[in-house]
């Protein structure tokens, strides 16, 4: 596997073309370029590689937890929104892929608030700050914690960090 450096706009375009959780960048590009999965790529000269875009350190999330900002916030909905916004900033592609999670009867995340309203009359969709996503908000704190835990698990965060974040909501 090779790593390439992309401009942000191209990176976000590729991420927006994700169809399901776990779809790799290679799968997305093959689909967009209409290339079969087993076709061998031509051998080219190696290029300078950039660091792959991964959750790895989750610097923004750690900074949010360490700053005490979440503890200062009185309302769980505001803490929930801060966490979601930070997760998106840390890893937009992983967040986009992970937003495919759904409840038994409801869609939790969407780029379209009407899609959330269609999954239930009392979902109260709100925009996630600094992201193109909307999230249902008419849920209890436990459900919000569960949504964040599912989202973070899909994004590749470890159990310890997930527990720490959910405990702060």
Swiss-Prot record:
Keywords: Cytoplasm, DNA replication inhibitor, DNA-binding
Organism superkingdom: Bacteria
Annotated GO CC locations: cytoplasm
Coiled-coil blocks: none
Localization: Cytoplasm
Major localization class: cytoplasm
Keyword Calcium applies: no
Single GO MF descriptor: DNA binding
This protein's record includes keyword Cytoplasm: yes
A biological process term (GO) from this entry: negative regulation of DNA-templated DNA replication initiation
Family listed: Belongs to the SeqA family.
Protein role: Negative regulator of replication initiation, which contributes to regulation of DNA replication and ensures that replication initiation occurs exactly once per chromosome per cell cycle. Binds to pairs of hemimethylated GATC sequences in the oriC region, thus preventing assembly of replication proteins and re-initiation at newly replicated origins. Repression is relieved when the region becomes fully methylated.
The protein, known as: Negative modulator of initiation of replication
Organism: Aeromonas hydrophila subsp. hydrophila (strain ATCC 7966 / DSM 30187 / BCRC 13018 / CCUG 14551 / JCM 1027 / KCTC 2358 / NCIMB 9240 / NCTC 8049)
Gene from which the chain derives: seqA
């Amino acid at each position: 596997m090779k790593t390439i450096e992309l401009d942000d706009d191209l990176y976000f375009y590729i991420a927006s073309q994700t169809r399901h959780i776990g779809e790799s960048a290679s799968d997305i590009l093959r689909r967009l370029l209409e290339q079969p999965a087993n076709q061998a790529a031509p051998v080219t000269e190696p290029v300078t590689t950039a660091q792959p875009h991964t959750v790895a350190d989750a610097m923004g999330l750690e900074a949010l937890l360490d700053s005490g900002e979440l503890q200062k916030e009185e309302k769980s909905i505001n803490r929930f929104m801060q966490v979601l916004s930070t997760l998106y900033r840390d890893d937009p592609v992983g967040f986009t892929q992970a937003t495919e999670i759904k409840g038994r009867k409801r869609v939790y995340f969407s780029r379209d608030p009407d899609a959330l309203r269609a999954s239930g009359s009392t979902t109260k969709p709100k925009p996630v700050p600094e992201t193109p996503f909307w999230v249902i908000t008419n849920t209890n704190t436990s459900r919000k914690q569960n949504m964040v835990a599912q989202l973070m698990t899909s994004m590749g965060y470890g159990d310890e960090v997930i527990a720490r974040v959910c405990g702060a909501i």
